[in-house]
Amino acid sequence: MHCPYCNASDTKVIDSRLAAEGAQVRRRRSCNSCQERFTTFEVVEVVMPRIIKSSGKIEPYDNDKLRRSILLPLQKRPITIDEQEAMISRIEKRVRQMGEREVSSKVLGEIIMSELKTLDDVAYVRFASVYRDFQDIDAFHQEIANIRPNDK
C-alpha cells in the first residue's frame, strides 16, 4: 500500500479490526518513510445485479447512488457512521442474496425502506415521502399511521 502523503511503498499495518458488521476490515497503517498514519478499508469485491429503472432503462448498480439516497434522509439524525455503513452492507447483502442478474428499482427501494424503518422512523418517513412521491400532508399522516398502528 502506497502512503497517501509521500507515495512511499514502505508501509506497515499497525492495527486491523472488523467494521460494518464484518463486511469490511479497517486497517491503521504507518508509513516507514514519513511516519504519517492513515486508515484503509478492505472490502470483498462482489458483482451486484443491474438495476431496472421504472422507465425500463437498465443501469449498472451504483453504490454511491445508494449511499446518497440513504444519507440524505439520515441527515441530522442520531445515527453513527458505523450504523449507516452496516445498513448499506445489509441492503447490498439482501440484493445479492436474491441471486438475480437484474433487480427492479422498486424492489431496491422497498429493501431500503424496510432497513430505514428498523433504523430510524424519521429517516424512513423522509425517504418514503420522496420514494412514494407524497403529494400532501395526508400521505405523511397515513405513512406515520402505518409505522405506529397502535397510536390513534
UniProtKB/Swiss-Prot annotation:
<dbReference type="GO" id="GO:0003677">
    <property type="term" value="F:DNA binding"/>
</dbReference>
<keyword id="KW-0479">Metal-binding</keyword>
<keyword id="KW-0067">ATP-binding</keyword>
<comment type="similarity">
    <text>Belongs to the NrdR family.</text>
</comment>
<dbReference type="InterPro" id="IPR055173">
    <property type="entry name" value="NrdR-like_N"/>
</dbReference>
<keyword id="KW-0863">Zinc-finger</keyword>
<dbReference type="InterPro" id="IPR003796">
    <property type="entry name" value="RNR_NrdR-like"/>
</dbReference>
<dbReference type="InterPro" id="IPR005144">
    <property type="entry name" value="ATP-cone_dom"/>
</dbReference>
<feature type="zinc finger region">
    <location>
        <begin position="3"/>
        <end position="34"/>
    </location>
</feature>
<keyword id="KW-0547">Nucleotide-binding</keyword>
<protein>
    <recommendedName>
        <fullName>Transcriptional repressor NrdR</fullName>
    </recommendedName>
</protein>
<keyword id="KW-0678">Repressor</keyword>
<keyword id="KW-0805">Transcription regulation</keyword>
<dbReference type="GO" id="GO:0008270">
    <property type="term" value="F:zinc ion binding"/>
</dbReference>
<keyword id="KW-0238">DNA-binding</keyword>
<dbReference type="Pfam" id="PF22811">
    <property type="entry name" value="Zn_ribbon_NrdR"/>
</dbReference>
<dbReference type="GO" id="GO:0005524">
    <property type="term" value="F:ATP binding"/>
</dbReference>
<keyword id="KW-0804">Transcription</keyword>
<dbReference type="Pfam" id="PF03477">
    <property type="entry name" value="ATP-cone"/>
</dbReference>
<comment type="function">
    <text>Negatively regulates transcription of bacterial ribonucleotide reductase nrd genes and operons by binding to NrdR-boxes.</text>
</comment>
<dbReference type="GO" id="GO:0045892">
    <property type="term" value="P:negative regulation of DNA-templated transcription"/>
</dbReference>
<feature type="domain" description="ATP-cone">
    <location>
        <begin position="49"/>
        <end position="139"/>
    </location>
</feature>
<keyword id="KW-0862">Zinc</keyword>
